[in-house]
């Protein structure tokens, strides 16, 4: 750009232009530094513009990653705290030169940190040139493959698909590829055959896949970095990013994908808006070392240091134009985008005012954007709230909403990311029309020439402050939602723009906004510019507006009852919510998390050895280990803690029928079980019988009374109405009382004989029957083996404390005690010595920008630059993948109707259809006439038990009742709970001395007593004889404890001791004798409100009350709770035969019935036209055994045909890989014989207390038990403390409408009405019948407060009050004493069978059952397919007959036979073509040609020969004169017609091949297309349509869509006897191919690598084109069955299916990696036909 463009009208360079030139020089320096800073490592994610929150800085350049506010993220890419999330639709591709420098050479290290979400075979990244892969890392399910070009790969057994975080390093050093894991502690290496090639500069780098159509990596990538050395691989953890370390630390908690900005460090004095990253959580903050580049300290610059309070304007841009912003309360931040992305970012203009003119849109809305030293807190916005961006119209305009006072809306940010496409198109049209003048082009060159942002001033470098998109400061005006379409603009010329810049020092008062100017004229379209560089992807759009609320959902199922429902399982993570509006400015953040732990302190002095601790308690018994092999009988062990209840196992096979046991005695009625949790809904049961007419539905809500209409004439009786829709099922009522036995019904009419019903579905498994009666005692069996060792018993109660032991030895010195408390502050010490001279301080900050210097002289005009060279042609794109198989063709035209079939047999009656849905609610009928009063009805049956009424009011105080008669002595009550410790009793009288006790047993040696006082001197004994002086003896041990002395006299009574603590609870004592009847005690004080008592017996029918006032009709009540299932009523009388119902809908398909009897062969019918493809019919008649067909495409199911007679056996079908649904559960086998009783095992230890089991299933409702005997009156309990107010429960779902309530009691008396006019005295009426009880009246208004009454007498015990709110759960009580067994209740009624439950989840695999008895002989199986031809084995039994050989080649042509006799007259030929009119003969018209004779023997004649014969005959006819005889003309006409007939048949045979050797087809599908009546069989084909001599015979499977199946030369050989040319043509004419290979093996497991022993590889298969089918690859064959792993000395087989969309890969020509056979190992390979379609 020449400098002349910067001159102003005054001939000088403006300060702004001079600043821009200076900043460009700085930008070039930054670019040069960044290129040399790449040697430390290339961050691939940063280069792709996907830098996350964690950024490490290199050199002196502050790298700020492109986040959601500066660079648009590609589709399928999300940013999170831990890195970049790639989804399945993410596709990121970039030229390699934009990612890696061209000078990158080996060795190099790839540092990777990732977490995978989905298991697949995707590439993490790939580098490819055209269709050649140069380098890539592929993640397989259990492997990691490094591709290094030249089809060289190195595989590592490393699994990264486990949803965990992995970090590893891969080094490439010439031909050695290594992988380092666990921070370099482990590594694996592999070598390639040649050195790894260097990268081509024209290559393409792809992240997450190898191309767009292959599998995509789905997961999070926190680091992908390439280092140009291998030194960092051994300690690669030192180079991991912080976000990788944080992700590894938070392995347990996974964050959902979300888009976030960068974490930012903020100064303490800067208020941050709510929601700003860094204020949410302490994890989002950076330390100064992380957020500042090298060379800067962490000190902050106070606001006062800015001269005159000026803040540095901050300009940001990511494209060709810049929106200038000013920050008044924040520190500006710098930005450095990717050096290779081609972006253009504007530079910072400090301390200059830029005043932009108003931009006018078609809505006549104005906005003035300015950058100044001081900006108002709010920008002015017009009344419509729409904002037009500054410099709108340039490419890639980026606006940021961070500047204080510039309310830039989200709609205007990120380069119009949120305007629709029409708006952008209109904007481009307007710009194209308006940017033609030289001034605007010059301005665009100025704005487009700035390359990178440079930090100007120290405050720019010290602080980074990034904001997420959509956040605003509280003093800014929030954006108005809406769109804008700028149409016409009023642009300044370049000189005017600089004039505005020069006038910034002239500060006048701010004027009022002027009126909008008129739209400018349309500019001349400018010349089309050169194609610019490809821009980086735009930012993500803001979330859309929330949608309207959806329709109300269906009513949910009723909740569980009773009790509060259990907490549901945690739901799946919800979708990412919309970005909320910016919140208000938050307060100062909380104190940050504590810093990293300090360095490890020095080791303290070792403490003294401590005393030996007391032995610990025995640990808990561990869980039971897996069941091992039965070992020898071990020592009696302790019982393990009971394990958790396992899941229900799968239902076992039906057991062998046992001997039916004798009927056992009737068991006792069990106790009613607890109410279990409500089980899941059961499966739909089998259709029940048609029920009777249901009860009428509930009455609807009474509508408002309409005006009374005129009384119409009585209408004629209407016709019989249709039966109403069935009402909803009524709520189950309470259990009714036992009804009176009904009278026997009248004998019904004999019903019609019904059709034979189809076998019903298998019934629900019945409940286990009652245990049978004990059988007769059997003979004494042999003694069984000793039983298993019993479980150890529970740990016993701790015994009593033993006697005090002897005094122990002196213990070791204890450890040092804890440090003492902090002492008081000591006196101030003396002044210490002077310290050393400090190091030199850091250089001071860079000074502020000086005053602008004088304008420089005008520069010289620069030379015109040369035109750039045309770029090289880009690399050729990769070849596309094979297209998807075409959809199935349209359905063919309908064929002509076939002949009428014979009358079918009468079908089986279908299942009764389900009851129809209730019809719509009919319109409200007209009010009927008031009927006459009916006669009083008879008393109705006993009503159902009503709901519990409200608690009655407290009754009046009752008088003292008379003393009752002495009651019978009650039964002994249960032992009471232990009472509290009583107060110390009075000192008792000293008792008499007791009897002498029995001598106690010798106790243990007690502790040595203290020496007693010196005893009295004893009486001197007789002198003994003088003994010999013996040697001094050793010191003897202490003697044994002496026997206890006689009991001494009783001492004086001691003083009363202190009250002891309550002892442990004693065991329940023996029941005492019944005491005497005590006297009646005094009447106690009235007790507290008791719990509500049980409902009493229903009272007798009361007298009818007086009729109350008519109450208002109540609203429909809520439905009551579901009642208890009542006892099934008695069977009613047989109803009359109803009318014939309507034909119900088609019932569900029943289970397959037994095969019918073989019918007689009917006459052969005429051949019908080809109909539409129907469903798979029943088994057809037995045909010749053909080649197994493959599974065809899924067709639309046709209507089910009538069941035909049992056909003969058809072709054996191919083994299907899809398992059928599991069969119904088998019937329970009969009870087996009772086993012999084993020997009594040794008594085991008492087991531990068992873990409380899971709550059992809900038992049947037991009958109410008989009332128990009345217990004795318990002691008065203390009044409990009032429990805390319970938490308010979650409001339950609204219940169903309840049964109409019982008519209420008469309401209170209403207010006295005004006195009415005296009426005429009426005649005395007859006494009326007592009326029914009226509804609850309307409550009257409250009356006046009455005078206080006299104090009433003391009230009696009030009625039970309502139950209080549930108190807080009390502490767990001690285990209660075992209660006495209750009175056995009566046997309850048998409950109604419950609904069939849902199908249970498949249980765990059960333990293998015991070996069953030998089963009965099974039915004769179907004949299996013909076995393969065996190898030549040892001379033994003659093997089975081999397969039929192929049809031999055609033999040589035989000699010409003798002329046979004259054949009979042939059939009439087809009508020939009409010939041309011949020349008129001299003898008049010739007679008509005679009928053609019998056709001669067919000869091989082609079209050329026929035409040649025709031409020769015509030429001969022309040579003859017209005087030929009539016979000559007739003979010529005959030859012509014969030739034409042959030509017609020959053309027809070419168009419609017959599949014969003389007229072969290309492939079998041609026969299916040309002929509509073909059947499966052998046909001849010629794929290249050459000479018919190279045609070959194939099997055409038209049932599978026209497959062409080639049989191998031999079953045991992989050869097919077809030339390569024909096979290539067959491949070209086909779209898919299948091939099945079976390996018969004897003790040779060789398919899966998991079964392979040793270093041998699993077997693989070589296809026709040389590709290899093997395990864990994309060409892995489908294993239909694999029994070769069974090595039991019998033949087994492994069956493989090869199905591919690339026919060139089949047939399989070789089986590789077959192991060497041992002495007892054999195998052979069986090849089935290969079929092409």
Curated annotation (Swiss-Prot):
GO terms for cellular component: collagen trimer; collagen-containing extracellular matrix; extracellular region. Residues 102-229 form the Laminin G-like domain. Residues 1237-1246 have a biased composition (Basic and acidic residues). The keyword Glycoprotein applies. GO terms for molecular function: extracellular matrix structural constituent. It holds the Pfam family COLFI. Residues 1045-1054, 1084-1093, 1352-1361 have a biased composition (Gly residues). Its main location: secreted. Residues 573-599, 699-708, 923-944, 1056-1074, 1175-1205, 1323-1339, 1371-1386, 1434-1444 have a biased composition (Low complexity). Residues 512-524, 776-789, 912-921, 1485-1495 have a biased composition (Pro residues). Residues 312-324 have a biased composition (Polar residues). Disulfide bonds: none annotated. PANTHER family: COLLAGEN ALPHA, COLLAGEN TRIPLE HELIX REPEAT. This is Collagen alpha-1(XXIV) chain. It comes from Mus musculus (Mouse). The gene is Col24a1.
């Amino acid at each position: 750009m020449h400098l002349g463009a910067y001159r102003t009208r005054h001939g000088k360079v403006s300060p702004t232009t001079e600043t821009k030139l200076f900043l460009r020089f700085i930008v070039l320096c930054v670019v040069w530094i960044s290129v040399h800073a790449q040697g430390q490592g290339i961050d691939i994610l940063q280069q792709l513009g996907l830098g996350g929150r964690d950024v490490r800085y290199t050199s002196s350049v502050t790298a700020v990653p492109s986040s959601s506010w500066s660079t648009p993220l590609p589709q399928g890419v999300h940013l999170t705290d831990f890195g970049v999330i790639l989804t399945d639709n993410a596709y990121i591709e970039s030229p390699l030169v934009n990612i890696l420098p061209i000078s990158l050479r080996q060795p190099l290290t790839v540092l990777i940190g990732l977490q995978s979400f989905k298991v697949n075979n995707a590439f993490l990244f790939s580098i490819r040139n055209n269709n050649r892969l140069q380098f890539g890392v592929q993640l397989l399910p259990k492997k990691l493959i490094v591709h290094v070009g030249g089809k060289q790969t190195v595989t590592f057994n490393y699994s990264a698909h486990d949803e965990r975080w992995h970090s590893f390093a891969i080094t490439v050093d010439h031909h050695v590829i290594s992988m380092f894991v666990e921070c370099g502690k482990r590594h694996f290496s592999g070598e390639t055959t040649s050195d790894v090639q260097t990268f081509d500069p024209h290559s393409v780098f792809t992240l997450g896949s190898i191309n767009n159509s292959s599998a995509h990596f789905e997961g999070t990538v926190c680091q992908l970095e390439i280092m140009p050395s291998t030194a960092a691989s051994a300690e690669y953890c030192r180079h991991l990013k912080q976000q990788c370390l944080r992700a590894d630390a938070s392995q347990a908690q996974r964050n959902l994908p979300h888009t976030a900005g960068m974490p930012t460090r903020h100064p303490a004095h800067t208020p941050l808006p709510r929601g700003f990253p860094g204020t949410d959580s302490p994890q989002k903050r950076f330390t100064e070392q992380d957020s500042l580049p090298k060379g800067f300290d962490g000190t902050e610059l106070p606001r006062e240091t800015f001269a005159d309070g000026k803040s540095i304007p901050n300009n940001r841009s990511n494209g060709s134009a810049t929106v200038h912003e000013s920050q008044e309360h924040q520190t500006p931040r710098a930005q450095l985008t990717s050096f290779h992305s081609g972006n253009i970012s504007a530079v910072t203009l400090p301390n200059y005012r830029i005043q932009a003119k108003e931009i006018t849109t078609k809505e006549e809305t104005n906005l003035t954007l300015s950058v100044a030293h001081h900006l108002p807190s709010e920008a002015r916005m017009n009344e419509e709230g729409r904002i037009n961006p500054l410099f709108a119209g340039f490419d890639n305009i980026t606006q940021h909403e961070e500047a204080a006072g510039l309310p830039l809306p989200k709609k205007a940010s990120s380069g119009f990311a949120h305007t629709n496409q029409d708006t952008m198109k209109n904007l481009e049209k307007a710009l194209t029309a308006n940017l033609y003048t030289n001034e605007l082009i010059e301005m665009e060159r100025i704005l487009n020439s700035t390359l990178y942002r440079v930090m100007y001033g120290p405050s720019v470098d010290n602080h980074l402050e990034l904001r997420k998109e959509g956040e605003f400061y509280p003093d800014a005006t929030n954006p108005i939602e809406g769109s804008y379409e700028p149409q016409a603009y009023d642009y300044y010329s370049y000189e005017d723009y600089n004039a505005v810049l020069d006038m910034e020092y002239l500060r006048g008062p701010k004027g009022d906004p002027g009126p909008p100017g008129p739209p400018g004229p349309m500019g001349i379209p400018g010349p089309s510019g050169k194609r610019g560089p490809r821009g980086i992807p735009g930012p993500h759009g803001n979330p859309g507006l929330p949608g309207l609320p959806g329709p109300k959902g269906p009513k949910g199922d009723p909740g569980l009852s009773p009790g509060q429902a259990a907490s549901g399982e945690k739901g799946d993570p919800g979708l990412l919510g919309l970005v909320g509006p910016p919140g208000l400015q938050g307060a100062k953040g909380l104190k940050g998390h504590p810093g990293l732990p300090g360095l490890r302190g020095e080791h303290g002095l070792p403490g003294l050895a401590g005393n030996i601790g007391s032995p610990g308690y025995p640990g808990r018994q561990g869980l039971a280990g897996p069941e091992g092999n039965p070992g020898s009988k071990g020592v009696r062990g302790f019982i393990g803690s009971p394990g958790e209840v396992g899941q229900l196992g799968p239902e076992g096979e039906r057991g062998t029928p046992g001997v039916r046991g004798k009927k056992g005695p009737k068991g006792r009625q069990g106790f009613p079980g607890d109410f279990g949790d409500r089980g899941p809904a059961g499966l739909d049961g089998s259709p029940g019988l048609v029920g009777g007419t249901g009860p009428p539905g509930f009455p609807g809500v009474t509508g408002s009374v309409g005006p009374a209409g005129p009384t119409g004439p009585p209408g004629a009786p209407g016709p019989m109405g249709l039966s109403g829709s069935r009402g909803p099922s009524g709520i189950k009522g309470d259990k009714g009382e036992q009804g009176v036995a009904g009278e026997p019904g009248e004998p019904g009419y004999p019903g019609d004989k019904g059709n034979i019903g189809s076998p019903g579905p298998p019934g629900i498994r019945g409940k286990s029957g009652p245990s049978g009666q004990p059988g007769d005692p059997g003979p004494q069996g042999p003694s069984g083996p000793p039983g298993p060792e019993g479980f150890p018993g529970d740990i016993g109660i701790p015994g009593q404390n033993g006697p005090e032991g002897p005094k122990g030895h002196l213990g070791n010195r204890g450890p040092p005690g804890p440090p003492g408390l902090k002492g008081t502050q000591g006196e101030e010490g003396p002044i210490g010595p002077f310290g050393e001279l400090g190091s030199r301080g850091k250089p001071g900050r860079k000074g502020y920008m000086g005053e602008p210097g004088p304008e420089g002289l005008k520069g010289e005009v620069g030379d015109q630059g040369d035109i750039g060279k045309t770029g090289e042609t880009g690399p050729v794109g990769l070849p596309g993948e094979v297209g998807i198989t075409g959809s199935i063709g349209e359905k063919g035209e309908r064929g002509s109707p076939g002949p009428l079939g014979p009358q079918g047999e009468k079908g089986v009656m279908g299942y009764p259809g389900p009851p129809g849905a209730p019809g719509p609610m009919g319109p409200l009928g007209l009010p009927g006439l008031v009927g006459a009063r009916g006669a009083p009805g008879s008393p109705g049956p006993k009503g159902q038990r009503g709901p519990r009424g409200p608690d009655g009011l407290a009754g009046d105080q009752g008088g003292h009742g008379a003393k009752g008669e002495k009651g019978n002595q009650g039964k002994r009550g249960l032992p009471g709970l232990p009472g509290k410790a009583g107060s110390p009793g009075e000192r008792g009288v000293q008792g008499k001395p007791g009897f002498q006790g029995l001598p106690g047993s010798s106790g243990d040696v007690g502790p040595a007593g203290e020496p007693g006082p010196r005893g009295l001197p004893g009486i001197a004994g007789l002198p003994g004889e003088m003994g010999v002086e013996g040697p001094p003896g050793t010191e003897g041990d202490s003697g044994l404890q002496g026997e206890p002395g006689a009991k001494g006299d009783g001492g004086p009574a001691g003083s009363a001791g202190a009250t002891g603590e309550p002892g442990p609870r004693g065991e329940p004592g023996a029941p005492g004798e019944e005491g005497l009847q005590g006297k009646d005690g005094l009447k106690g004080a009235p007790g507290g409100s008791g719990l509500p008592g049980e409902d009493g017996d229903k009272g007798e029918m009361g007298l009818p009350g007086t009729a109350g006032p008519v109450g208002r009709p109540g609203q429909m009540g809520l439905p009551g709770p579901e009642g208890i299932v009542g006892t099934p009523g008695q069977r009613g009388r047989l109803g009359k035969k109803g009318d014939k119902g309507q034909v119900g809908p088609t019932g569900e398909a029943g289970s397959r019935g037994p095969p019918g009897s073989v019918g007689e062969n009917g006459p052969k019918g005429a051949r019908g036209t080809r109909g539409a493809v129907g469903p798979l019919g029943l088994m057809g008649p037995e045909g010749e055994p053909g080649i197994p067909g493959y599974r065809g495409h899924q067709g639309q199911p046709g209507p089910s045909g009538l069941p035909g007679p049992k056909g003969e056996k058809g072709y054996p079908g191919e083994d299907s890989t899809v398992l059928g649904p599991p069969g119904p559960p088998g019937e329970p086998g009969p009870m087996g014989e009772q086993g012999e009783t084993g020997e009594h095992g040794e008594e085991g230890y008492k087991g531990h207390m068992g873990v409380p089991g899971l709550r059992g299933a809900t038992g049947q409702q037991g009958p109410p038990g008989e009332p128990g005997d009345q217990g004795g009156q318990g002691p008065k309990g203390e009044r409990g403390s009032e429990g805390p107010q319970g938490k308010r429960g979650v409001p339950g779902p609204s219940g169903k409408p309840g049964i109409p309530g019982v008519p209420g009691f008469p309401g209170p008396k209403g207010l006295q009405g005004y006195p009415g006019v005296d009426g005429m005295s009426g005649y005395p009426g007859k006494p009326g019948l007592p009326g029914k009880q009226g509804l609850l009246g309307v409550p009257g208004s409250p009356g006046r407060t009455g005078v206080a009454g006299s104090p009433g007498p003391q009230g009696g015990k009030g009625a039970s009050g309502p139950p209080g709110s549930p108190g807080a759960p009390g502490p767990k009580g001690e285990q209660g004493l075992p209660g006495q067994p209750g009175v056995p209740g009566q046997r309850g009624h048998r409950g109604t069978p419950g609904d069939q439950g849902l199908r249970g989840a498949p249980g765990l695999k059960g333990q293998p059952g015991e070996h069953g008895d030998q089963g009965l002989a099974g039915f004769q199986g179907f004949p299996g397919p013909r076995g393969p031809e065996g190898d030549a084995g040892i001379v033994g039994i003659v093997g089975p007959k081999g397969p039929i050989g192929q049809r031999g080649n055609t033999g040589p042509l035989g000699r010409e036979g003798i002329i046979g006799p004259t054949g009979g007259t042939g059939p009439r030929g087809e009508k020939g073509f009409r010939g041309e009119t011949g020349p008129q003969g001299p003898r008049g018209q010739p007679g008509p040609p005679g009928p053609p004779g019998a056709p001669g023997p067919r000869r091989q004649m082609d079209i050329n020969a026929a035409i040649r014969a025709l031409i020769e005959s015509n030429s001969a006819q022309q040579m003859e004169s017209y005087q030929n005889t009539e016979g000559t003309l007739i003979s010529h006409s005959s030859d012509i017609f014969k030739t034409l007939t042959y030509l017609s048949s020959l053309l027809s045979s070419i168009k419609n091949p017959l599949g014969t050797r003389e007229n072969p087809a290309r492939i079998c599908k041609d026969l299916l297309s040309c002929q509509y009546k073909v059947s499966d069989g052998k046909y001849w084909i010629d794929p290249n349509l050459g000479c018919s001599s190279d045609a070959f015979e194939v099997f055409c499977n038209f049932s599978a869509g026209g497959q062409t199946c080639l049989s191998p030369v031999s079953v045991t050989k992989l050869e097919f006897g077809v030339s390569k040319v024909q096979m290539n043509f067959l491949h070209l004419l086909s779209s898919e191919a299948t091939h099945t290979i079976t390996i018969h093996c004897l003790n040779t497991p060789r398919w899966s690598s998991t079964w392979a022993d040793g270093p041998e590889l699993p077997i693989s298969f070589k296809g026709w084109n040389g590709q290899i089918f093997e395990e864990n690859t994309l060409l892995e064959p489908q294993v239909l069955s694999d029994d070769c792993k069974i090595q039991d000395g019998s033949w087994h087989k492994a069956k493989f299916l090869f199905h591919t969309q690339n026919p060139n890969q089949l047939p399989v020509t070789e089986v590789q990696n077959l192991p060497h056979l041992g002495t007892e190992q054999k195998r052979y390979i069986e090849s089935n036909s290969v079929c092409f379609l």
